[in-house]
Amino acid sequence: MMARRDPKSWAKRLVRAQTLQKQRRARVGPRAPPPDEEDPRLKCKNCGAFGHTARSTRCPMKCWKAALVPATLGKKEGKENLKPWKPRAEANPGPLNKDKGEKEERPRQQDPQRKALLHMFSGKPPEKPLPNGKGSTESSDYLRVASGPMPVHTTSKRPRLDPVLADRSATEMSGRGSVLASLSPLRKTSLSSSSSLGPKERQTGAAADMPQPAVRHQGPEPLLEVKPTHSRPEGGCQEVPQAASKTHGLLQASRPQAQDKRPAVTPQPCPPAATHSLGLGSNLSFGPGAKKPAQAPIQACLNFPKKPRLGPFQIPESAIQGGELGAPENLQPPPAATELGPSTSPQMGRRTPAQVPSVDRQPPHSRPCLPTAQACTMSHHSAAGHDGAQPLRVLFRRLENGRWSSSLLAAPSFHSPEKPGAFLAQSPHVSEKSEAPCVRVPPSVLYEDLQVSSSSEDSDSDLE
């Protein structure tokens, strides 16, 4: 049996077993490669050495214990300054060093001159020289000493103002003072004129041939005085008092002054509440047969519109004597209206604490205006139905000369409407007008002769 075994086959089995053992040991730990495995043609990508690859265990990048610092291939004397040049001794300076020294000394000599000029212009005191003989410290001295603070130069003198700026400020202050002084006389004169008038004189205004629209300022300041020119009014009356269907929109009476030939229209501030008397309203007259302008100029309004309020007046039905109602605002001339000829419209009315100044508008007729005695207001019949209270009423009559006349029919405040006699007794101008001959005219004629924009009434009603 033993003779039958081949020794070669036994040797092969032994070699195989040894190789298997070696492979098992290599998996457990690194093994040193035999010398025949090194190939000088191979190069490692990790360390850059020849003789092994990146997968080889001989690579020093994998076994740090055997890692060696790679040596340089050659010295780079051209790139590295291995032997720096030593500075030359000051005893034998070269020609270049002499030129540099002269250039440095020149600016140092010019520094005191510059500082002296700066002190003269800026007014700062000259700096005292340091004890070590140096005139100024270098900018990097405070960085060398860690504990030393940064030097700060302070002066006890205040900076001087530029003379040009001082002159400008003085001229501006003087200019403001002159403007205030020029404005103050106007205010004083207007205040004196308003204070000189009595409570009754303030309620009456002066009328001229053609008064220009007065400019009203907000606040308690007096109004500007505008003197009119004696010329024929173009486009009808220059001012017509516009009022709403409330008692706060009533205007005071404006009576012409006979002794003043050319008085100035001076709207004054609001007087005490005296508009609830029965002498309310002014009368205006317009002549028929005139052309209507394209657009009526509107005067500036003082306050913003406010909500309307109900009036305390109630008008008796028995007090109406002929005429037609329905015009938003109508005016009545005085008895001597036809004799005086064309004149001016009434002055802008004053307001009471419960009233608001109304917007004055020109009528859409180019007719001459007659002098008026008192302002008169009435409300829309539609507004009366909307408010629920009985509004003021105006009686319209056509005169013999073809002009219209209007009279206010209103009951006294807080009185019963069943007493028309008291109202007629307190308002004599209404009784005088009732005696004049009158003709009943349909409302359409009144609307054509007296057209007033409804927008003005809405704005006046919202003023409250």
UniProtKB/Swiss-Prot annotation:
Q: Which domain of life is it from?
A: Eukaryota
| Region (Disordered) location | 1-43, 70-389, 415-437
Organism phylogeny: Eukaryota, Metazoa, Chordata, Craniata, Vertebrata
**What is any Pfam family matched here?**
zf-CCHC_6
User: PANTHER family this protein is in?
Assistant: FAMILY WITH SEQUENCE SIMILARITY 90 MEMBER A11, PSEUDOGENE-RELATED (PTHR16035:SF14), PROTEIN FAM90A1 (PTHR16035)
Q: Where is the composition biased (Low complexity)?
A: 182-197
Cite the record's Basic and acidic residues compositional bias ranges. Answer: 74-89, 97-114
InterPro entries recorded: FAM90 (IPR039213), Znf-CCHC_6 (IPR041670)
The molecule here is called: Protein FAM90A22
* Family to which this protein belongs: Belongs to the FAM90 family.
